[in-house]
Amino acid sequence: MTVRVICDFDGTISERDMIVSIMRHFAPEASEPIIQAVRAGERSVKDGVEAMFALIPSNQYGAVAAYAQAATAVRRGFPQFIHTCEQLGWKVAIVSGGFDFFVEPVIHNLSTASVDIYCNRIDASGSHLRVMWSKPCDEACDGGCGLCKPRVIREIAQPGDRVIAIGDGVTDVKAAKMADFVFARSDLLRLARELGLPHLPFETFDDITAAILDKGSELYAHLS
C-alpha cells in the first residue's frame, strides 16, 4: 500500500490564490465578475480561468510571470511537511489548476525531494493569453475542471493505495470526494463538513505534519 498525497497549490501551499491575485493586478474590473461567478459555482473553473487570462494581452506575459513569482508567499511549514512525507515513503503530488511559471519555481526552490507537479501553461503566441490545460477532464469526469484532479488521481493511484487530499477551495471538492482523508481550510473545510467527508482542518502545514506524526490522530483510522 502506498499513501499518495494530492496537494493543491493556490491558497493551500501559497497563502493567496495566485490566479485571483494576477487578475486583480492586471485586469481588476473585467475579471472580478468572473472570479465571483466561479466561486459561486455559476461558471466552471475551466471556462472562468480561460476567460480571465484572455483579458490580458500576450505582451504582458513576462510581467505577469514576474509578478506571480514575486508575490507568491508560501504557507508555513511546507518544506518540513514534504520532508516528513519523504521519510515515511509517502508520495506527494502537487496538483494545481495554476501555472508552471509560478508553481514550479516555488516547489523547486523549497524542496529537493521527489515531488510530482501537475499544472498548466500559458500560450502567449496570439494577441492575448491562452490557457493550455495539462490534464483536461477525462470520460469519467462530469467536466469543467480545467486541470482535472480526479483524472490525476485515477492515473497515479493503484488498487490498495490510500489517498490524502489537501486543499482550500471549490476546485478541490472532486478530489476530496475521492480521497480517504482530507486536510481542509477555507471553503473546502466548509464543504467537507457539509458533505461529511473524513477530514481535519489546517491553517499551516505544521498542523498537517503534527497530525501525520501523531499515530493516534483521526487520519490513521482512515489509512488502515
Give the ranges of each region predicted by the language model.
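C-terminal cap/substrate-recognition subdomain and adjoining C-terminal extension
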Residues: 77-83, 87-91, 98-224
